[in-house]
Protein backbone atom coordinates (compact mmCIF):
# COMPACT_ATOMS: atom_id res chain seq x y z
CA UNK A 1 0.00 0.00 0.00
CA UNK A 2 1.44 3.34 -1.03
CA UNK A 3 1.99 6.07 1.52
CA UNK A 4 -0.37 9.03 1.30
CA UNK A 5 0.29 12.62 2.31
CA UNK A 6 -2.07 15.24 3.65
CA UNK A 7 -2.42 18.64 2.02
CA UNK A 8 -4.75 21.59 2.49
CA UNK A 9 -6.34 22.79 -0.73
CA UNK A 10 -5.83 26.46 -1.60
CA UNK A 11 -8.47 26.35 -4.37
CA UNK A 12 -11.31 24.10 -5.48
CA UNK A 13 -9.87 21.06 -7.28
CA UNK A 14 -12.18 19.00 -9.49
CA UNK A 15 -13.00 15.56 -7.99
CA UNK A 16 -10.73 16.21 -5.00
CA UNK A 17 -12.20 18.90 -2.75
CA UNK A 18 -12.98 22.51 -2.07
CA UNK A 19 -10.84 25.41 -0.88
CA UNK A 20 -9.72 24.78 2.70
CA UNK A 21 -10.36 21.02 2.69
CA UNK A 22 -7.81 18.70 4.27
CA UNK A 23 -7.29 15.80 1.83
CA UNK A 24 -5.01 12.79 1.50
CA UNK A 25 -3.34 12.31 -1.87
CA UNK A 26 -0.49 10.32 -3.34
CA UNK A 27 2.90 11.91 -2.67
CA UNK A 28 3.69 12.25 -6.38
CA UNK A 29 0.37 13.98 -7.09
CA UNK A 30 1.07 16.47 -4.31
CA UNK A 31 4.74 17.00 -5.19
CA UNK A 32 4.38 17.15 -8.98
CA UNK A 33 1.02 18.82 -9.50
CA UNK A 34 -0.81 20.29 -6.49
CA UNK A 35 2.07 22.08 -4.79
CA UNK A 36 3.78 23.57 -7.91
CA UNK A 37 0.45 24.78 -9.32
CA UNK A 38 -0.38 26.49 -6.01
CA UNK A 39 -3.52 24.37 -5.61
CA UNK A 40 -2.49 23.02 -2.20
CA UNK A 41 -0.20 23.59 0.77
CA UNK A 42 1.57 20.98 2.86
CA UNK A 43 -0.02 20.43 6.26
CA UNK A 44 1.64 22.31 9.12
CA UNK A 45 0.37 23.50 12.49
CA UNK A 46 0.03 27.05 11.19
CA UNK A 47 -1.93 25.97 8.13
CA UNK A 48 -4.23 23.82 10.28
CA UNK A 49 -4.89 26.82 12.55
CA UNK A 50 -5.76 28.93 9.51
CA UNK A 51 -8.13 26.24 8.24
CA UNK A 52 -9.89 26.01 11.62
CA UNK A 53 -10.15 29.80 11.82
CA UNK A 54 -11.68 29.96 8.31
CA UNK A 55 -14.16 27.20 9.13
CA UNK A 56 -15.22 28.94 12.36
CA UNK A 57 -15.63 32.26 10.54
CA UNK A 58 -17.69 30.60 7.78
CA UNK A 59 -19.90 28.84 10.34
CA UNK A 60 -20.48 32.14 12.15
CA UNK A 61 -21.38 33.82 8.85
CA UNK A 62 -23.89 31.07 8.02
CA UNK A 63 -25.50 31.38 11.45
CA UNK A 64 -25.73 35.17 11.07
CA UNK A 65 -27.34 34.80 7.61
CA UNK A 66 -29.91 32.36 8.98
CA UNK A 67 -30.72 34.65 11.93
CA UNK A 68 -31.20 37.58 9.55
CA UNK A 69 -33.51 35.44 7.39
CA UNK A 70 -35.56 34.44 10.45
CA UNK A 71 -35.85 38.12 11.42
CA UNK A 72 -37.04 38.97 7.89
CA UNK A 73 -39.53 36.09 8.08
CA UNK A 74 -41.05 37.38 11.31
CA UNK A 75 -41.23 40.89 9.83
CA UNK A 76 -43.03 39.62 6.72
CA UNK A 77 -45.41 37.39 8.67
CA UNK A 78 -46.17 40.20 11.13
CA UNK A 79 -47.49 42.31 8.28
CA UNK A 80 -49.26 39.24 7.00
CA UNK A 81 -51.20 40.58 4.03
CA UNK A 82 -50.03 42.51 1.00
CA UNK A 83 -52.41 44.16 -1.45
CA UNK A 84 -51.87 44.01 -5.21
CA UNK A 85 -54.21 46.10 -7.34
CA UNK A 86 -55.02 44.88 -10.84
CA UNK A 87 -57.52 45.95 -13.45
CA UNK A 88 -60.51 43.60 -13.28
CA UNK A 89 -63.31 42.68 -15.64
CA UNK A 90 -66.55 40.80 -15.16
CA UNK A 91 -66.86 37.91 -12.71
CA UNK A 92 -63.86 38.94 -10.59
CA UNK A 93 -61.40 37.94 -13.31
CA UNK A 94 -58.41 40.19 -13.79
CA UNK A 95 -56.72 41.26 -16.99
CA UNK A 96 -53.44 39.39 -17.17
CA UNK A 97 -52.04 37.57 -14.17
CA UNK A 98 -50.24 38.31 -10.92
CA UNK A 99 -46.52 37.57 -11.28
CA UNK A 100 -43.63 37.04 -8.90
CA UNK A 101 -42.44 40.55 -9.75
CA UNK A 102 -45.77 42.04 -8.67
CA UNK A 103 -45.53 40.26 -5.32
CA UNK A 104 -41.88 41.30 -4.83
CA UNK A 105 -42.79 44.90 -5.61
CA UNK A 106 -45.72 44.85 -3.14
CA UNK A 107 -43.45 43.45 -0.42
CA UNK A 108 -40.78 46.07 -1.14
CA UNK A 109 -43.30 48.92 -1.02
CA UNK A 110 -44.78 47.72 2.28
CA UNK A 111 -41.56 46.77 4.11
CA UNK A 112 -38.68 48.44 2.22
CA UNK A 113 -37.08 44.96 2.15
CA UNK A 114 -35.90 43.79 -1.22
CA UNK A 115 -37.03 40.26 -2.08
CA UNK A 116 -35.74 38.39 -5.11
CA UNK A 117 -38.67 37.58 -7.37
CA UNK A 118 -37.17 34.19 -8.24
CA UNK A 119 -37.53 33.12 -4.60
CA UNK A 120 -41.31 33.64 -4.59
CA UNK A 121 -43.63 30.70 -5.19
CA UNK A 122 -47.24 31.49 -5.97
CA UNK A 123 -50.19 29.74 -7.61
CA UNK A 124 -51.70 30.80 -10.94
CA UNK A 125 -53.71 33.92 -10.12
CA UNK A 126 -56.36 35.03 -12.61
CA UNK A 127 -59.12 36.20 -10.24
CA UNK A 128 -59.58 38.68 -7.42
CA UNK A 129 -59.25 37.27 -3.91
CA UNK A 130 -56.83 36.06 -1.25
CA UNK A 131 -53.90 33.76 -1.99
CA UNK A 132 -51.06 32.18 0.01
CA UNK A 133 -47.53 32.84 -1.26
CA UNK A 134 -44.22 31.33 -0.11
CA UNK A 135 -41.11 33.51 0.00
CA UNK A 136 -37.81 31.63 0.31
CA UNK A 137 -35.47 33.81 2.36
CA UNK A 138 -32.76 31.23 3.06
CA UNK A 139 -32.16 27.57 2.30
CA UNK A 140 -33.85 26.65 5.61
CA UNK A 141 -36.22 29.62 6.07
CA UNK A 142 -39.43 30.13 4.10
CA UNK A 143 -42.05 32.74 4.97
CA UNK A 144 -45.70 32.27 4.04
CA UNK A 145 -47.61 35.49 3.43
CA UNK A 146 -51.05 36.27 2.13
CA UNK A 147 -51.70 38.52 -0.82
CA UNK A 148 -54.97 40.15 -1.68
CA UNK A 149 -55.65 40.81 -5.34
CA UNK A 150 -57.99 43.80 -5.47
CA UNK A 151 -59.59 45.71 -8.33
CA UNK A 152 -58.26 49.13 -9.30
Swiss-Prot record:
Checking Gene3D superfamilies in the record gives: Ribosomal protein L9, C-terminal domain (3.10.430.100), Ribosomal protein L9, N-terminal domain (3.40.5.10)
Q: What InterPro entries does the database record attribute to this sequence?
A: Ribosomal_bL9, Ribosomal_bL9/RNase_H1_N, Ribosomal_bL9_bac/chp, Ribosomal_bL9_C, Ribosomal_bL9_C_sf, Ribosomal_bL9_N, Ribosomal_bL9_N_sf
Quick check: keyword Ribosomal protein in the entry? yes
For molecular function, the Gene Ontology terms on record are:
rRNA binding; structural constituent of ribosome
Q: Does the keyword rRNA-binding apply?
A: yes
| Classification via SUPFAM superfamilies | L9 N-domain-like, Ribosomal protein L9 C-domain
- Assigned GO CC terms: ribonucleoprotein complex; ribosome
UniProt keyword annotations, A-Z? Ribonucleoprotein, Ribosomal protein, RNA-binding, rRNA-binding
One of its GO biological process terms is:
translation
Q: Which domain of life is it from?
A: Bacteria
Per its database record, what is this protein's job? Binds to the 23S rRNA.
| Family the UniProt entry places it in | Belongs to the bacterial ribosomal protein bL9 family.
Protein name, as recorded: Large ribosomal subunit protein bL9
Q: Which organism is it from?
A: Synechococcus elongatus (strain ATCC 33912 / PCC 7942 / FACHB-805) (Anacystis nidulans R2)
User: Gene for this protein?
Assistant: rplI
Amino acid sequence: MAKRVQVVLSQDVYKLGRDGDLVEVAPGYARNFLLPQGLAQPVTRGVLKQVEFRRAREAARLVAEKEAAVARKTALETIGRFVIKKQAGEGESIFGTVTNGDVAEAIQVATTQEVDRREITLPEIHKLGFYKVQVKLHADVTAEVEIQVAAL
